[in-house]
Amino acid sequence: GTRVQNCRFNACTFDHCNFSGVVFSFTTMKDAWLLNSAFRSMAWGGLQGKSGVFQPFGKIKNCAFRYNDFSGMALNGFDWTGAELQQCTFDDTRLAGASFYGVRLGGTRFTRCDLQKADLRTAEEYAIDLETNKLKGARFSFPDVVRLLDGTGIVIE
């Protein structure tokens, strides 16, 4: 893949772009707008380090993310509405108050994430481990909320 290192993106707009295999390292992104774009096999975790002082994304609209890794990021309160996240990874990601309202999350995995007060109503196809994620106050809707029971070993008839 392509390594983007020691760069700074402030208030940039990426519209009708296709990115594949990009790994960010020691790079800052602040309030970037991602519009009508596709992102494949991206590793976003190196964008902001571990500080979480600012949001890398200002807005996402009509974007598809496939095989993206958002591990270790601070994305509290971010609105993912209108995005498609397929086979993505959120490990140790801060997503408190984030909105995934109506988002297709096919095969997307959440592990050791803070999803407190997150909105997953009408979100589809997610995999969220009840034991490792913080979910207090998170909002879900039926029937997809039943997916939370996948890892428990219980039988639903």
Language model features: what each stretch is:
Residues 1-157:
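Tandem repeat scaffolds
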